[in-house]
């Protein structure tokens, strides 16, 4: 009996001591690349700022963000469809006030320049399901898609699903720490669409950055807390802007506004990166 008790104690002690070959989960963001996922001109920017700048055109940009984490690649938003690159006059909207989009560089070509194959990317997340953000989701048919359930369930044109039913998906209901180490957090920011989301990324040298998605479209709207006319819920939009403002303060973070050309002109684009 004494031998049995002694053996049990020995096994308990050995089990309580971390083993030398036990590998902790890898953590931390290593790099963030800003990819050119579209450029265009809005016919009338009052579409995004009701009652302000009526009749004025404005240059827009569209960004995707490739995040290299210790556990693998994450792509945030997929931009205008790569097929638009072959359209000499760009993709013209039905509404002349909206954006005529061009695709100077395909997403596939920019990934190739970095030596990244679409199959290397195991996770993608989209801010929302407007076409300028989900245009290339099916370049990554096996990647886990992170999207809010409210967005996934939101009917598309003619009640069509917004994603292929066979695409692997994680339907979120609120914020999500993607890698479990606090370095990449999806923030639920509904309003522009029912399940809109933004992304908080913590970089070792650059510090914290919030990727807005379309919670805000350009700096003037952010400064004046304006909700666009193309919007699901104004009160939710304003509440989400406040959530982002609180996050910026708490994390001492920068706000990178997806469609703001003036801001993007001052940022490094791929193949340069932030770390």
Q: How would you describe each model-predicted region?
A:
Residues 82, 95-109, 200, 205-275:
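Cap/insert and terminal regions of metallo-dependent hydrolase folds
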Residues 37-38, 78-81, 129, 150-151, ...:
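Active-site metal-binding loops of divalent metal-dependent hydrolases
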Residues 18-132, 144-188, 206-213, 233-254:
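Metallo-beta-lactamase
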Residues 6-16:
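Bacterial N-terminal signal peptides
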Residues 1-4:
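Positively charged n-region of N-terminal signal peptides that target proteins for export
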Residues 54-58, 187-192:
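Short Gly/Pro-enriched turn/cap motifs at secondary-structure boundaries
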